[in-house]
């Protein structure tokens, strides 16, 4: 009888431990499921964009996405670019010395560019068309929002119902698409665009004026993008689409 009682007690204890382990395992599985659901429900809107996210573009990252070229350059701070469908992109940046990036084409051309800036917050210096040529090496801007004047005023050019001021300046031993170099900047500034509406930029008008009045010609097309640039310890965000 003692032997049977001992076996009964052992059996009861083993059964109790097994049941306890099953309960703990089940609770852990449920907790894990709830955690995943919570993460999915609170994911930032920017993370719902599909495509590549570059967390640390320094000094420059480039690539292609959905048939478009993209570029992101950064000095200091932090910055990332995220891609949506077609020509959509979003850039977030914090405490940057300089950041310039966006989406477009490589090579560029004298095309008619459409764009829509859906969201823009924080501090920035420029939003518009940005690109480069080689032979000669030229960095060019068409400022739809913000201001990139500075240097020598050349003339005014009319395009898309607006008057742009053309400024030209020389950069000496500065970062470029071929490394540190000396090159000219061509900068057309209007600055009157706004968020949430479809706009267009006829690059033929700008390029013809640069070629005829810039004094350096225009060179061979390198990349050409709808871009944001911010410098001077700025932070902000843009979500825009180009076509």
Where do the model's predicted regions map?
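An exposed acidic His-Trp-rich patch
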Residues: 136-196
């Amino acid at each position: 009888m003692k032997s049977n009682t001992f076996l009964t007690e052992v059996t009861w204890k083993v059964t109790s431990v097994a049941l306890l382990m099953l309960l703990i395992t089940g609770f852990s599985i449920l907790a894990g499921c709830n955690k995943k659901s919570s993460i999915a429900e609170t994911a930032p809107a920017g993370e719902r964009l599909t495509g590549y996210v570059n967390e640390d573009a320094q000094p420059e990252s480039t690539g292609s996405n959905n048939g478009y070229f993209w570029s992101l350059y950064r000095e200091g701070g932090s910055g990332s670019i995220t891609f949506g469908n077609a020509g959509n992109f979003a850039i977030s940046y914090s405490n940057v010395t300089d950041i310039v990036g966006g989406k477009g084409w490589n090579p560029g051309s004298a095309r008619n560019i459409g764009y829509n800036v859906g969201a823009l917050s924080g501090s920035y210096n420029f939003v518009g068309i940005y690109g480069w040529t080689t032979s000669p090496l030229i960095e060019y801007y068409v400022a739809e929002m913000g201001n990139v004047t500075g240097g020598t005023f050349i003339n005014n050019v009319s395009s898309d119902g607006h008057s742009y001021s053309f400024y030209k300046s020389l950069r000496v031993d500065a970062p470029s698409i071929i490394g540190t170099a000396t090159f000219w900047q061509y900068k057309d500034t209007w600055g009157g665009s706004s968020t949430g509406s479809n706009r267009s930029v006829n690059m033929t008008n700008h390029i013809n004026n640069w070629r005829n009045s810039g004094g350096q010609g225009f060179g061979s097309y390198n990349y050409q993008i709808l871009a944001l640039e911010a410098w001077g310890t700025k932070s902000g965000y843009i979500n825009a689409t180009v076509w």
